[in-house]
């Protein structure tokens, strides 16, 4: 059973899509989607199509590094912005400064 699941995007209507983000009990991060609608039926011959990407816990440091690099690249205020982001999202962190 997944320890935490949230829906991060949803499109209602004839061409339905739901995108979920899951943190599994073993630390795996998974992003998956479900499509329902006439396009799915036409292409796959079924009423729904599900697909996703899983990143094992052992790869999370690399994932975090690359996401942070992409988010903050070129920003001179990156340290302050990162500290604020961690605080806002309840991510345990430590701020340090020295002279």
Where are these predicted regions, by residue range?
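A short, structured beta-strand/loop element
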Residues: 20-57
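Mixed-charge, Lys/Arg-enriched low-complexity segments
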Residues: 42-99
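Short, charged/polar N-terminal "headpieces" of proteins
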Residues: 1-29
């Amino acid at each position: 059973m997944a320890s935490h699941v949230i829906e991060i995007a949803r499109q209602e209507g004839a061409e339905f899509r739901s995108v979920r983000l899951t943190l599994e009990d073993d630390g795996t991060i998974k992003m998956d989607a479900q499509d329902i609608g006439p396009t799915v039926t036409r292409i796959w011959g079924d009423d729904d199509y599900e697909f996703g990407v899983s990143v094992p816990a052992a790869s999370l440091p690399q994932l975090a590094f690359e996401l942070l690099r992409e988010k903050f690249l070129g920003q001179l205020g990156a340290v302050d912005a990162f500290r604020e982001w961690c605080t806002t999202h309840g991510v345990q962190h430590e701020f340090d400064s020295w002279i």
